Each structure stands twice: as C-alpha cells, then as structure tokens.
From Swiss-Prot:
Boundaries of every HP domain copy: 1641-1704
Species this chain originates from: Dictyostelium discoideum (Social amoeba)
Acidic residues composition-biased segments: 854-873
Membrane topology of the entry: Peripheral membrane protein
Disordered: annotated segments: 439-460, 606-721, 848-877
Protein name: Villidin
Sequence ranges of Low complexity compositional bias: 613-636, 651-701, 709-721
GO cellular component: actin cytoskeleton; cytoplasm; endoplasmic reticulum; Golgi apparatus; membrane
Molecular function terms from GO: actin filament binding; phosphatidylinositol-4,5-bisphosphate binding
The protein's role, per its UniProt record: May function as a linker between membranes and the actin cytoskeleton.
C-alpha cells in the first residue's frame, strides 16, 4: 500500500495569487496639498494621521492631516513648526499614532505629540523631546517596532545612533553608536517577527550590514549587494517561517532588481533569489506584509509591484497601475486599518504628482462571509513589548510586537468552520506552509522540487504502513503496523482498519526522532530504512519503512508536528512563529551573525555524551528540563514612557487580547549548527550519537550509531489527553454492556467525543487523566439504535468498529439521539456522505439536544423492549457452516452494518467472530430454499448461511439475499471496477476528452468535431449545430427519451420532437393518442420557452397530413415516402422498460480520495426522486441511450473530472448503441430532458396516466379554537419588550438622515432632521458606542404615501450603506404610524410628519396637525386634512396659518400632548409666527375663520358627544386593536400594537376595544365563519373580562367599512380618506349597529327556498352552504332525494346540481 501524504498541486498553490488593487473613490481623495517636493522623504502615516513636508516656511514645516478628514485640505493646514531648515526625515511612533519624530538639515532631532482632540488649533511649535544637536545633517529617524523608548537616528557622518528616550529632554543619551558605513545610510530594518534583536542597514556604498547592537557597534556581517550607483533599500521578511532580507536596487545597466538573502548564510556573495523588476530609474522601497508574505515595491513612478515571497523564490503577482497619474511617494498603512470584511489585505497612501493623496487597497478575492484568518493573522496592537533599558540589559532577550486578533465581533473564523462548510484546517494550513518552506532543502527528506515550488512531492506524511520491532523470546521481528498522526498525537494501529491504537503518544512527549548514521552504516541497507521514536520517559519505538524517502518523510513530519504544537508560553519568540520555527537547514558553516547570536548559547548547549544521555533516560520525568537554561533577565526599574499610550508594562501581561511577551532566554534556542527539525541532512560540523537500550535483533550485525533528528528537547507534558473544553462536542454518562463468562454486567462510564475521538473514563472527575480507552471514530463502521440488549431501563444503541461492537445505553431518547447524531458525523463513511448540521459545542447534554431524532417509541424501554424503529439494520439469527472436516452448522447472529457483514456468537457479543466486507464478494448464490452462499472474486466460498424455512407469507432467505445484494452493489467502487486510474484524473483532461461548453458551463473547452460525436452541447443544439430526436412513448406510463436521429426511429403510435435549435418540430403518428400528443406539444413548448427564451419556432406535423416539410425529413436523412413502423404498439411499449442507473462521485475529505458508488438503480417505470441529488456531489445518470453528468454547485473539480471519466467508460461499453451521447449539466441549469428522468422534478410535465405514489405529507386539518380560548387572548394585555438604547438628537445622539429621490439618497437638511414627509422615504443612520467600539443602526423609514419605487430604493440603499460601514450594524424597517420606540426616541417631542413630498412643501400654506401619543416618546404631530372636522376632543391639534400658529387643546387631551405640542410648534415655526394656545370651547372667531376655505366650523368628535353618551368613557384605558382572521385555515385573534388605519383589512374582522365601546369593523370579504366567531368572541370576552368590561358598561357596535362612525375613527392616528374607493365618496357616516341585532341573523339555521334565492342573501347566510339552511321537507322537494342520498353523491357532482337549482 502506498503511504498517504499531503498532496501537492501541479499548479503553484497560493492564497494571494489573485490579489488585485483598487483605488478609492474620488470623494475620498485628499486634495489641495502643498508639498515640498524637494524633501528627501515625502509621505509617512500612522493609523490616524499622515504627514508630508510642507512648502510653507521654506520646507521647515511638516503638515499633518487626519485620515478621517477626506476631501480638500485647508489652505493653511495644521503644521509642526520647530526647525530652521527644511525637514529631511520624519517617522511616526509604532506605539502612539499621534507621536512623530522629525530630523532636519539644521542638525536637530525633535519628537512631537500631535493633539488628539483635533488639528484645528494653532500650529504645533513646542516639541515633546528635543535631542542634542548633531554635528552633521540628520538623514534618518527610526523607532523600534517592539521596544519602547528605543530610537535611532542617522546623520551624514555615516553612523547610526541608538537613543534611550526614557530620560527626557537633553538628558537623552546615545547608548550605542553603530559604525562601519562608508556612505549615506539609506534604510534600516529590524527582524521584527524573529526576535527584534538584529538590525540590517543599506548604504549608498552598495553594501548591506548586519548588526547585533547589544553586543558590538561594528557589523557582524557585511556583504556587497546591488551595483547601481543610486544605492538600494531593504526590509526583513521574517514571518510565517521565513527569515529573509529583501533588498531592492539596480545593476550597472539600471535594471531594478529584487534580491532575497538568508541572514544566517551571508558568507555567500550571491543572493538566494534574484528577480528583475523594471527599468525605471526611480529608487524603489520594499514594504513587507507579515500576514501574507507579500512584498510591495514602490516609489516615484507609475505603479506598485507586488511579489509573494517563499524560501527559495519570489513570485511576481502583478503591478498596480494608475493610468497617467504618476506618484511621488507611497507609504504602507498599519495592518489594523484594513477592512477584513472585504478581504482588504493591505492599504497604501499614494502621493501623486498633482499634490493629492489617494488610498490604494490590495484585496484578495474570497466569496465566503467567514473571517479569513489564514490571510489575517493577529496584527500589532500598538503597545510595546518591553522597554529600552530591559532590552539592552538582557542580551538574550528576543521580542516581537504585541498582537491582537483582527476578527470582527460576531463573525466566525475560517478555522472555526469545517472544511465541508467552506472552512479550513489550521493544521493543514501550517503544514502546507512548512511543506513549501522545506521544498528545495538539502537532504534526502526534502522531497525535491523546482525553483518555483511548482512541483515535487511533499516531504510530509500523515499516515501509512510501516513495520515496528516486536520483542520475542529468542529474537525480535518487524511486523506491519499502521502509523498515523492525528492532531497532536501519533497513533500506532495493528492495521489500517483498527479503531483502537496499540500505543499512542502526544507529539510533544517525543524527545527526538533518530535515524542511523549513514556514514557508519556498514551492515547493510536495512538500517537505512529504520528510525526510532524516543519518548521523554525513555521509552523507544523502533520503526522500519519501505524506502528511505518514506523514512525521511516520517521523520520530518513528526518533527514538524512537534514544532507546530509547541505551547505558546514564556518561551515564545513570535506569535506568528509560535506554532513552528524553522532553523538553518543548509549544511554550511554558520555565518558570523549566527556565531555572535549563539556565542553564549554554545556553552550552555552541548550534545550530551552517551553516558549523560543514559543518565537522562534513567531520570525520566524527574528532571525533564535539565538541559533548559534558566532565565537570567536582570531586574530593573521600568522607566515611564513618554511615547507609548500605555506606559505600564505590567498591565500588558493581563491584557487578554495580546500575545504574551517574555524573554526568549527562558528557553534559549540551541545553535543553528544542529540539525533542523525539518531536515535530516547530516551537517559537516555536527554528528550527534546516542545510546539506546540493547536488545536482541534479527540481524547478527551491530546497528550503526543513531543520529539525533531534532534540535531541541521538548518540555514534557502530562500524558493525559489534555482535552480542551472548547473542543468537546458531546460528553456524558453512558452505560456499557460488559460480557462475562457467566453473566453480563452493566458499567457506567463517562464518555467524551472530541476531535473525532471517543474517550471513556471511569467517571467525570478523572477526565483530565489518561482515558480507559480511545476509539478513533473515523475507523468505526456504524452507529445505530438497538433493542433487547439491556435488561435495565433506558435507550440503547450500538457503535461498531472493525473488530469490536460496543453496546451503550442512554437514559433518555433525546440523549441517545444526540449521541447518535454526533457519532455518525465521524464515522468511516462520513467523509463522503451528505454533511449533517454542525452541532454547537457544549459541555452539557441539555445544550446539545436541539432537534431529537424522529422516533415512534412511546415507552421507556423497561426490560429493554422498544417499539419497532423506522429504519432497522438487516440482522437476525442464522446458522453458519463451520469450517472443519465434519462441516457442522452452528448458530450465529448476523448483522449488516454499512458495507460489512458481522457474524457474532449472539446478539450481545462484543467481538465478531467473522467480518465479511461485501466489496470483496462477487456472488451471492441461493443454494436451496433456505440456504445461500457468499463467493469471493476467485469464486471461492467465503461463508454458507442457512435461514428458517420459507413460508407462504415470509421468505427469510430471499430477504437476506436481496438485502445483501443491494449492499454489495453499493459497496462496489465504480472507479476500480471500471479500471480508471485515479491519478490520471488529477492531471488536466486532454482537449479531446473535454466536455464541450454549454450554456452555464463556460469553464469548459469549446467543442470540436470529435466532441459533437460524443457529447451533447446544449449551446450547439440551441444554435442548430447539433440536432436531437426525442420520442414520447407509452400508454399507461408516458415516457420521454432520446432516440437515433433517423426516420427508422419514427412510429405511428408515438409523437416525436425534432429539436433543430431555431426550429422545433413536433411530429405525431397517425395512431397517436391525444394524451401522447398533448405531452409532446407541452414538452416541446417548454423547451421553446424555458431553454430558448421563446425564440425558437414551433412546427407541428401530423403523419399523412403535413408531409410537405422537407426540412424535417432532410434532417432525419429520409423523405416523407419512407415507411413508418407500426410496431411496437403502445401496449407492447408499456411492457418495455429502460434501465436507469445513477452513480454518485464523492470526495472523501478524510482520506483525500475519490469514490464512485451506485446511488440508485431501477427502470423508467419507477423514477427516482430529485432529492437523491446533493449539491456536494457529481452524478452520472445512465439511461442506456442517454448519459447525463450532473454537477453539484459545491462539488470539487476532481469530482467533475472523475465523473467525466466514468461517463466515457459507460459510453464505450460494447453493448451500448453507437449514437449514445453524454450531456453535462450543472445544478439549477438542467434541461427538460434530464428532468423527465426524475419523478418529482420542479417543472415536470403533469401529464401522466400512471398512478402517483401516495405521499404521507398531506397537511392535516387544524382543529378550530374554542370561543373561550380566543376570548382569553383578549384578556392578556400587550407588553412591549423593546429595550431603549437610543439617545435623542437634542441630548447628543449621533444621527444622519437621507431622503430618497430619483433612486438615490440625498442629504436631508439638518434643520429638518425631526420632520418627515408622508410621500417620501428616508434612511436614518444612528451611531453609538458599544463595548468601546462604534456600532450602527440603519432605519429605513417608509412614508405612508411614498411610492413603491422609493420604498424599494430605500431598502437596497440601506444594504449599500451597511456594506460601507465599519463595526456592528443592524438594519430596521420602519413603517409610518407603526414606528418602533427606539426610532421615535431619536426625535422625542420634536417629530412632525407633513403630508406630501418635501419638494412640494409650502410652509406658508395653512395646515392642520394632530398631536397624539401615549408618552413623550410616542407623541408626534401628523398633518391631517385641513378641515375642522378633523379636530378631536381627545387630543391636541396645531393649526398653522401664515399669520399665527394655534395650539388647540381638546378638553380630554393628555398633559403630555399639550406640553409636547408647544415644543413641536416651535420646531417647525420657521417664520417666527406668534403662537397662541386655545382650549376647546373658548376658540376665537379668528380660529374658526381659518377653516372657511373648507366649510368653516363643522361637526367633529367633541366633548358633547362623549358627555351625552349613555355609557361613560374611560380616559385612562389604553385603546387596543385586534384582528380576527381565518387565513391560517382556522379563526385566530391577534393583537396589533401599535395600530393604524392601514391595519383595517376587508378580508378580516377588526376589533377596536376602548372599554366603554367595542367596535367590530367587519370587512366585506371576511368569511361567514370569521364574522360569526368574532361577534361570539367579543361577547364572551365582556363576560369574562377583568379589565373593567361588563354588559352594563361596555357597548358592542358593528362598524361598516367606508361608513365608520365618528367615534370609531377618533381613536386612529390621522384618519384620512385618500385611499377610499371613489365610489364611496363623499362619506356617509352611520352609527354603529348593536351586535345583538346582527348576531341573531348569523345564528338562524333554517330558511325557505325562496329566501335563499333572494339577492342579496339574508344577513348571516353562508353562500357556500345554502343547501344546509333548508329543512328536511324542503330539501327533499327541491333536490328530489333525502340528505342521506345527497351525501353519497361525489362532491363535484353536488356542486353541479346546486348550480342547476341556483343554490350557489
């Protein structure tokens, strides 16, 4: 068997190869900049600011602009003024966005702090720190990326000064002066992500220098680089396993070049990689992105080049160009500013030649909505790791920046979602990264590969067959074992199918991996194939591989997993490299840099002698860290930082969002001259030997000495599983059946499922110790319910592995369902089955039980008895012929589990006696009526079984044979059966084998002449290049299939469809039935409309009548005189059946292999259901004369290629007709011919004469609620649970309002923010702080009279606005008169709604507003019709005239309304008109004269109406509104709050309850049942109400639509008649009718025949049941039969009789 490894694609895989650039919109440009273009540096930025040298003051000023202030910069921008000569260099601090350092030609260096409150104050002239004046001009200023107060400056004396800024002002001193440069220093770079202790510089003397500034002032390495006279610039690329230096310069021919150097191997004068970039003359600067290993090159010119860096290559991805607008400078913004929601990986500022600054974003296209953590690792938080004094004191201290996650709140990471759902495995990601970095390394384990990383095998292996040394009595032997690495453990199994390991060990408990030294290998080749795994406790596992390559792969893989799983503790060097760390793998002498770095470590780390190693093994775990040096960090006082926003170093230790900083000296790295953990190549300088436990081996020779294959000894961990609670999917108590010799026992254990493993413990308290046993669920075969296993109460189920059966018992049915659901997701076959819903990880069972499994069990399994389950595996008691001379028969229990047949002694057995894999069975033969035999592929007997004797009612033997045969067919791998080479599928298909492009299949090749003979191309058919003939055949079962394109296919009994693209012919035989013709015509018409968009012409032809269509006969290759077949007849066709077979091609994600299995088999008499097709698979549908390849949307490319191979093999079968073609279809792009192959495909033709399958999914009729139940709903008051979080505008709420106009959002005038117009729609953005972050709510407000277009526009513009915002955002739809409380709170006591549109608004026109509401938040003014009839004594009204504003207080209006009315009137009083307050009854003539234009003083709902009522009105009762409807099939009563006039629906009955009155507004289209029920409910409610209702104090009135009484309308906000039908105007108000008068008509049950013929019908009569109102005597006279005889007549016939008698 070939060992399984991580596959490497032929095409170079890259996460960023499709990165593209995008310039921001013009409105986000920064313009009107006055830049001193003569300055050496032109542009720098922080997260909040950007700076540029200003031309003001002769270049001695530095202009600062906020990144949030887009647009035109003021003519006099904010500047830093403090130098007398032009500024030559400047740099922002890494720890404070508002701190910047400047250097000038006046030889001064100053540190400034820009005020955070804004840049509108006076210019900044007082620096924070002024350093001592230099002797020569300052050329550069730099901050350390991790160390606080460490500052550097370079001058024209060609030195680099390092300052400690802890002591402020002139006391700041140079603590180190780096010398050795011979010309101007052009750039400086720190190894930010690999320790922060090395410094590289580039100089105009064409040399690069490396410094260890804490050890010496002179360079530890100097190397010549680019030959160009202009010099070069550099940066470090030292994240994600890289440790490189990138330099960008030019050669003598002015060709710009990119070099990659290994800082550990600089003794070679040649770079690792050299790439030509461009011939432009400008100097390019490199910018490194630590998250994606990309390097951007840019400067003065016309673009930005970007490369992806690998260990041995730099891949050019692209160039960002900007047309004719050239740039003067660029700067990379901090990583934390990018928008991860749109996959923006980097953002630059670009200073153009037109003195404007543009933002340029680089984006990586990803479709998923998940957080793409693989390209967005934690970024620097902006806080220091340590300070200057501590860093200089400890020369072994390595520091990296503090990091914080970039994941937005509420978004899942791509690593938190399964691969089946579009997620990624972090483990695989890291291993693939390690694989890329290892390719090309020296040594036998490297695996090779070309320079581009486009080929070669991966050096990593995850599972495979090896041999292990097994101790024997006389000698040891090597036996086959199956080794596998899973997560953080290595497991050794007896074979590949075993579910329980022989031994296992955490990878961190492996001390090292040894191989035998090749130089000492004198005993033969066998030693070169072996490696030893030595554990920390001294235990050793000796393994042997089949090849050296496999041995090397295992050694490197184990070490890679060890490095990747190192805990992030006090020894972490970098959060990016904390999971793995690469050391030097090249067998050359160490560079001076390495010697300097490790000169002290060489004394602390030495290779232990054999005696020392033996002592260490004897000590075991007593002193596991004996070789680990202790931290020697001195204790010093932390000085206060003047630069950092967070000066407290100790506070950072408890900062949960940051990576923990610590000195690396706590666990120092041994010298890099040791062997790499990822390479087993022997170096020339080190050969380590160890002694091992002496054992007797099968070879007489002595093994050569072992060579250590690692560089560090890991810290031992607890040998327990160390399961994290967050990784646990399910856990709980289960009872396991333990068989015994005499009786069985039931043992309770604590089971845990985590990361594909099932662990068992004695109890929960021992969960952190070693488990009793570990079962790999991916090796398990089946998990299903059982019965009659346990004798105690519970719900049993069974987990089956290849060599064991585990019987378990849960306490509840729901608990068992949850366990089965989890177990089945991890089974052996789950990798290719339909994915289940992902369970939420939880620590308790209650949280897991979300949807119990369907089960019809109704008892609690007392005595182990359950009811019959819906799906029971094939199992039972059989007799098996035992092997032996006498061939005896023995009883056994046989169960078919998945694709395996388990034979056990009895049902309670836990170990099967025999396991038969059905994939190895070639024949199941029935020997006798109750005996059958299984044969293998060699026709050898596998097993004989005997069943009970068959009876007339039951044949058990046939049942077993049919069940086993079906399972055997499903187990066959079609790929192997057809002899398809799976490796060929992984390579690109040749063009001759490519399926042609068709419709939605644009990613395939264009069809060639050969393609059209083998494939059906839907596009070619549409264009007329291909033609097909379709037959519609059958009588009882009409079927559609494709036949040969020839006149010989025609039959006089059938219809045929000739699809010629632009023309579709329908030819009907002379004896074709009408049903057959109808289906053919319908099918052809569907092709025309659905597939051709109605552009094809439909031509109908009948045999013997329309024979002059020469085109039809020409296409078929014949003429109308050709004889037409008369056989087979429709009856004979019905006896025919065409076999249909569906194969499913799946990808087993667990084994990374393809599987093609039989999914369905039958004939066209019983078609499969569409649900068999799953989007994650590809299906090959074989219909004998047609072959379809159906491609699921979520299937992989290799699945699609394999399906094509399977289809081609099927097409090439000998018994296949030569005109069979293959059609490729994508999901949702199926053609009509394919849909006809399924029974229930949407859009299938309904014409069929066969009996349809009876489904059990018929909706059951609902039971009507009792009147008392509906009435009780009205007694429960409505409670508004909306929590208030908004802040009104007047109190500081941040609100922005837009109005929708011409499909765009237009800024609403700010002074009208609380005023809206009923014919407009709006978007209101509210911004607030949530958890110290900005959050947003977008309300899109739909005016009551706004158009549908405006309402739709507001919705999609809200989505656009949401996408442009940063932070949490919620979208809320707000409808007029039903506004939510938080929206109203924004405009508290200010909100006004005017009639009409804003553009037509005339503030001088007289208008009337109704002020209504329950409290200050709910109160608002709504404009009503300008008529005195709209006044309401219950509320306040505002009358606005050009001369004066009147506030009219209704006699019974609320105080809150009266107070708010004044505030509202002042709000829209734009003309400063006087305001007069009037009370009802004391109005002036001037007030009433304002209404003269609309009829003057009219009747309105006044105090007299209330006082004259016989029933007193309650003014404290809140009106309530209910809707009574039977839309759901039964009568329901629901409360609406808030309610409005728009809730009145003519198809329902609406109930308005104001306590003193209850109005029933009966819609004209409400059903009879609803009307009657609503009246009965109200009357019952009054009798049972505890809210103050009673028959004496509550009057129930019926209101008619469009004739509502004035009292009814007065309780609605701003009642209007604008939406009334024109035939109902002018209004006629009618008083309400007492409900008792109406209800008595509905309760009347008997009417005469003459009364039922009246038009209109009597009130209360149900027009659909007129026959039920006749008494028995009249009924017999009218219908001439009794009611009993009437009910026996079918319903459809009864309707016809009723129509004849006009009772309908």
């Amino acid at each position: 068997m070939e060992y399984k490894s991580i596959e490497k694609s032929i095409v170079r895989e890259s996460k960023v190869r499709n990165v593209f650039s995008k310039v921001c919109k013009k409105e986000l440009f920064y313009t009107n900049l006055k830049v001193n273009s003569a300055s050496e540096e032109l542009l720098k930025s922080s997260k909040s600011l950007f700076a540029y040298p200003s031309s003001i003051g002769g270049g001695s000023c530095l202009s600062i602009t906020k990144l949030s202030n887009h647009g035109k910069v003021p003519d006099t921008p904010f500047c830093i003024k403090g130098h007398t000569d032009p500024i030559s260099c400047f740099e922002f601090s890494n720890f404070n966005d508002y701190v910047i350092a400047t250097g000038s030609r006046d030889c001064t260096i100053k540190i400034w702090e820009v005020p955070e409150e804004g840049l509108i104050k006076d210019n900044l002239v007082t620096p924070l720190i002024t350093l001592p004046k230099q002797q020569k001009r300052v050329t550069g200023v730099y901050f350390h990326p991790s160390v606080d107060s460490l500052f550097m400056s370079s001058t024209l004396d060609y030195t680099l000064d390092i300052w400690d800024l802890s002591s402020t002002g002139e006391q700041s001193s140079v603590i180190q002066k780096l010398t050795g440069h011979e010309d101007l220093i052009m750039s400086v770079g720190w190894n930010t992500w690999s320790g922060g202790d090395k410094l590289a510089t580039s100089s105009r003397d064409k040399k690069m220098r490396l410094y260890d500034p804490r050890s010496q002032s002179t360079p530890i390495q100097t190397i010549s680089t680019h030959e160009g006279a202009q010099g070069f610039k550099l940066c470090w690329a030292d994240s994600n396993g890289l440790e490189l230096i990138c330099t960008v310069g030019a050669n003598k021919s002015a060709q710009r070049q990119l070099y990659l150097w290994d800082p550990r191997q600089l003794q070679s004068s040649q770079p690792l990689v050299s790439k030509d970039v461009t011939t432009d003359s400008s100097i390019l600067s490199p910018y490194y992105d630590f998250g994606t290993n990309m390097v951007y090159l840019g400067g003065k010119g016309d673009g930005i080049y970007y490369y992806e860096i690998e260990k041995n290559n730099a891949h050019h991805i692209g160039k960002a160009t900007f047309g004719n607008v050239t740039q003067s400078a660029i700067t990379l913004l901090p990583k934390s500013v990018v928008d991860v929601n749109i996959c923006e990986i980097d953002r630059f500022l670009r200073l153009t030649a037109a003195n404007s600054v543009e933002m340029v974003s680089f984006m990586c296209p990803r479709k998923s909505q998940l957080f793409q953590e693989d390209i967005f690792p934690p970024c620097p938080s902006g806080d220091p790791t340590t300070d200057c004094s501590l860093w200089f004191a400890d020369k072994q201290l390595k520091v990296i920046p503090h990091t914080i996650s970039m994941k937005p709140d509420g978004v899942q990471s791509i690593y938190e979602v399964s691969e089946e759902e579009g997620g990624k495995s972090k483990e695989k990601d890291k291993l693939e990264q390690l694989s890329k970095l290892s390719i090309g390394n020296s040594g036998s384990g490297g695996g090779g590969g070309d320079g581009d990383g486009n080929g070669g095998d991966s050096p990593f292996i995850t599972e495979g067959i090896v041999k292990q040394e097994i101790e024997g009595w006389l000698f040891n032997s090597y036996e086959n074992r199956y080794l596998k690495i899973v997560k953080d453990k290595i497991y050794c199994f007896l074979n590949e199918d075993s579910a329980q390991a022989i031994w296992d060990s955490p990878v961190l408990n492996i001390k090292y991996v040894d191989i035998y030294d090749e130089d000492e290998n004198t005993s033969g080749e066998e030693w070169s194939l072996r490696f030893n795994i030595i554990l920390l406790n001294g235990k050793e596992h000796r393994m042997e591989c089949s090849t050296v390559k496999q041995r090397d792969a295992w050694c490197q893989s184990i070490n890679a997993y060890r490095e990747m799983k190192q805990q992030v503790d006090q020894s972490v060097v970098s959060p990016t490299m904390g999971e793995f760390h690469l050391v030097n793998t090249t067998p050359v002498a160490p560079s001076p840099m390495v010697i300097s770095e490790n000169k002290n470590a060489l004394q602390k780390f030495s290779v232990p002698s054999p005696k020392e190693q033996q002592q260490q093994q004897q000590q075991g775990s007593e002193s596991p860290n004996s070789t680990t040096p202790k931290s020697s960090t001195p204790t010093q006082t932390r000085h206060h930082s003047v630069l950092s926003r967070n000066p407290s170093y100790t506070s950072l230790k408890s900062s949960g969002g940051f990576s923990k900083p610590s000195p690396s000296s706590s666990t120092s790295t041994p010298p890099s001259t040791f062997a790499s953990p990822l390479s087993i190549a022997q170096t020339s300088s080190t050969t380590t030997t160890t002694t091992t436990t002496t054992t007797t081996t099968s070879s007489s020779s002595t093994p050569p000495p072992l060579r250590a294959n690692n560089s560090t000894s890991s810290t031992p961990l607890n040998s327990s599983t160390g399961i994290k609670q967050s990784d646990i999917v399910i856990e709980g108590n289960l009872t396991e059946l333990i068989p015994g010799l005499l009786w069985n026992s039931n043992t309770e254990k604590w089971y845990v499922v985590s990361e594909g493993m099932l662990y068992s413990y004695k109890n929960k308290s021992l969960k952190q110790l070693d488990p009793l046993e570990t079962i790999h669920l991916e090796k398990a075969i089946s998990a299903h319910k059982t019965k009659e296993i346990f004798t105690i109460q519970g719900f049993s189920f069974q987990l089956s592995t290849p060599n064991r059966i585990i019987h378990l018992l849960a306490k509840t049915k729901e608990e068992r369902g949850s366990w089965l659901s989890v177990l089945r997701q991890n089974l052996k076959s789950s990798g290719e089955t339909k994915p289940k819903s992902v369970l939420t990880r939880a620590s308790t069972m209650d949280e897991l039980i979300s949807s119990p499994m369907s089960d019809d069990e109704s008892n609690t399994n007392e005595g182990g008895v359950e009811e019959e389950e819906e799906e029971q595996p094939l199992e039972g008691q059989l007799s098996r012929k035992l092997p032996g001379i006498f061939s005896m028969w023995g009883q056994c229990f046989v169960a078919l589990l998945a694709e395996d047949l388990f034979v056990s002694r009895n049902k309670l057995s836990t170990t099967p006696e025999l396991r038969i894999q059905l994939s190895s069975i070639s024949l199941i033969k029935k020997i006798s009526p109750n005996e059958f035999t299984l044969y293998d592929s060699m026709n050898q007997v596998v097993c004989n079984f005997r069943t009970i004797a068959p009876t007339a009612e039951f044949d058990d033997c046939t049942r077993w044979i049919d069940g086993l045969e079906a399972a055997r067919k499903r187990s066959i791998d079609i790929i192997k059966m057809f002899g398809i080479n799976e490796k060929e599928v992984l390579s690109p298909l040749p063009s001759s084998s490519s399926i042609p492009s068709s419709g939605s299949n644009g990613n395939l090749l264009d069809p060639s002449a050969d393609d059209l003979t083998r494939y059906l191309d839907l596009t070619a058919i549409k264009n007329g290049k291909q033609k097909i003939l379709i037959q519609v055949k059958g009588k009882r079962k009409i079927r559609v299939r494709m036949v040969k394109l020839s006149t010989s296919s025609l039959n006089c009994h059938n219809s045929f469809i000739l699809d010629a693209g632009p023309r579709i012919f329908v030819w009907a035989g002379s004896k074709t039935s009408r049903v057959n013709k109808a289906k053919a015509l319908d099918f052809a018409n569907r092709i025309r409309t659905k597939e051709r968009g109605g552009k094809s012409t439909l031509i109908q032809l009948d045999q013997g009548r329309d024979e002059q269509s020469f085109d039809f006969w020409e296409i078929l290759g014949g003429n109308s005189s050709d004889p037409i077949a008369t056989t087979p007849t429709p009856e004979e066709q019905d006896t025919e059946s065409i076999k249909t077979t569906i194969y499913r091609v799946g990808l087993d994600v667990k084994k990374n292999s393809l599987r093609a299995r039989l999914a369905w088999e039958g004939t066209d008499w019983k078609l499969p259901n569409k649900e068999i097709l799953n989007t994650k698979f590809v299906y090959v549908v074989d219909c004998v004369t047609e072959i379809f390849v159906w491609v699921g949307k979520e299937s992989s490319s290799i699945q699609r290629k394999m399906a094509t191979k399977v289809a081609l093999v099927l097409q090439a079968q000998k018994d296949r007709v030569d005109w069979t073609k293959i059609t490729r279809l994508t999901e949702f792009g199926e053609n009509n011919l394919f849909k006809e192959k399924f029974a229930n495909y949407p859009g299938m033709l309904p014409i069929s004469t066969t009996r349809q399958e009876i489904k059990s999914h018929v909706a059951t009729s609902k039971v009507e609620h009792k009147i008392e139940t509906l009435a009780s709903r009205m007694t429960t008051p409505f409670i508004d649970n909306e929590a208030l979080f908004t802040i009104p505008i007047d109190e500081g709420g941040r609100v922005k309002v837009w109005k929708i106009e011409d499909y765009e959002k237009i800024d609403h005038p700010q002074h009208l923010y609380s005023q809206f117009f009923s014919s407009d729609s709006y978007i209101v953005l509210y911004t607030y702080m949530q958890n110290n972050k900005e959050a947003h709510v977008i309300y899109y407000y739909l005016g009551r009279d706004s158009s549908i277009n405006e309402k739709g526009t507001s919705a999609y513009l809200t989505v656009d606005l949401n996408e442009s915002l940063v932070g949490a955002c919620v979208q809320t739809r707000v409808v007029a008169n039903k506004e939510c409380k938080n929206f109203l709170n924004l405009f508290k006591t200010k909100m006004v709604i005017h009639k009409g549109k804003y553009n037509n608004y005339d503030p001088k026109k007289p208008s009337l507003y109704q002020v209504k509401g329950l409290d200050k938040i709910d109160i608002r003014a709504v404009q009503v019709e300008f008529s005195s009839s709209m006044l309401n004594t219950l509320h306040v009204s505002i009358l606005r005239t050009p001369e004066k504003i009147y506030i009219w207080h209704g006699k019974f209006s609320l105080d809150a309304e009266q107070n708010s009315a004044l505030s509202i009137a002042e709000n829209f009083n734009s003309t400063s008109a006087p305001i007069e307050i009037l009370k009802e009854g004391s109005e002036s003539n001037e007030f009433w004269s304002a209404f003269e234009s609309t009829g003057g003083r009219q009747k309105y709902f006044n105090d007299i109406m209330i006082q004259s009522s016989s029933i007193p009105t309650s003014f404290t009762y809140k009106p309530r509104f209910f809707v009574c409807s039977n839309a759901s099939g039964i009568v329901e009563v629901t409360e609406e709050s808030p309610f409005s006039q728009d809730d009145l629906d003519i198809g329902s009955v609406c109930i308005l309850d104001v306590q003193s009155h209850i109005y029933l507004w009966i819609g004209s289209r409400a059903t009879h049942r609803t009307k009657r029920a609503s009246m009965e409910v109200v009357l019952n409610f009054i009798e049972t109400s505890k809210l103050g209702h009673s028959k004496e104090h509550t009057k129930v009135l019926i209101a008619t639509p469009f004739e509502e009484p004035i009292g009814f309308k007065s309780y609605f906000r701003a009642w209007c008649t604008s939406k009334y039908p024109k035939n109902k105007l002018p209004l006629v108000e009618k008083d309400g009718i007492p409900v008792e008068q109406v209800l008595k008509d509905y309760l009347k049950e008997i009417y005469t025949y003459e009364e039922l013929l009246a038009d209109p019908l009597p009130a209360g009569v149900d027009s659909t049941k007129l026959d039920t109102y006749l008494n028995d005597e009249d009924f017999e006279k009218v219908f001439k039969m009794t009611r009993t005889e009437w009910l026996k007549i079918p319903a459809w016939k009864r309707e016809g009789i009723k129509k004849e008698l006009f009772l309908f």
